[in-house]
């Protein structure tokens, strides 16, 4: 038989999905917009709205990709594989991490297809890293030490760039 063009595991429904094309023909393009006060919305902001944010990065204190201490990568007791789905609340209150959240969703949202983060940024440094994560946020009453073995992070990407003085 013919193999699917793309096969994905949908964590919310705990099912495998098989697609004849990628992105799936049935996928609807939706945009999420940064809004004031850390809000994220499917509604496009007004043209004259000032939806920018800023932070100061300290290269001597980089943002960790997982909570400290970090165990050995492989071997007995290694938690290397599940770090992809670890709770990210440990960095939420850092002054060099920006976060936006939607209001609680009133219906299920499935994210499938090509995901693009469009950022407009400037830096006073000679290089910068911007990391964008799309995360399903747990309610505050969920403990921080839950384990989601077998689930995969839906989006995690890193783009590095070197800037020169002619770019702002």
Per-range role (PLM):
Residues 163-168:
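Single conserved hydrophobic/aromatic residue that forms the stacking wall/gate
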